[in-house]
Amino acid sequence: MIAALLEEGFPAERIERVGALKLGFDLRAHRVRDAVTGEIDVRRIEVKGRMRGQPIRLTTNEWYKAQQLAETYWLYVVWDPLGHLPDLVRIQDPFGKLDHAKREVVRFFEIPAKAIIEASGPILPE
């Protein structure tokens, strides 16, 4: 993805890997769009790699960030990333463009009250 951003004109020193920070995206890049006005082009990029034709999954945090950051949030999907001809697809504002197509899959862990009571044991004085 760094190579793609470099090809798009983003300076290497202005491309950051931020995935470990749990910000809702993997890369942050910025560049001067217009030197006269000082306008800056900012991209917050979530990267997904999947076999061609397979759905991608965004975390709740990633989806909410896509909604919040709108035009500055980009989804980069690499189809067949381990194949001979990986194909990069870029989508600016994925929330705005894909909200109609998303399917929400909610996962949680339900623990019965009885199990909680049984596992709690006696309360010991401090």
Q: Where in the sequence are the language-model features?
A:
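A short acidic/basic microdomain associated with nuclease active sites
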Residues: 3-33
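Conserved catalytic cores of phosphodiester-cleaving nucleases, focusing on short active-site segments
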Residues: 5, 27-29, 41-51
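A structural signal for short secondary-structure junctions
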Residues: 21-22, 36-39, 68-71
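Short beta-strand-loop-alpha-helix junction that forms the active-site gateway
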Residues: 47-64
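Conserved RecA-like P-loop NTPase helicase motor core
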Residues: 62-66, 74-76
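Domain-level recognition of nuclease-like catalytic cores that cleave nucleotide substrates
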Residues: 72-126
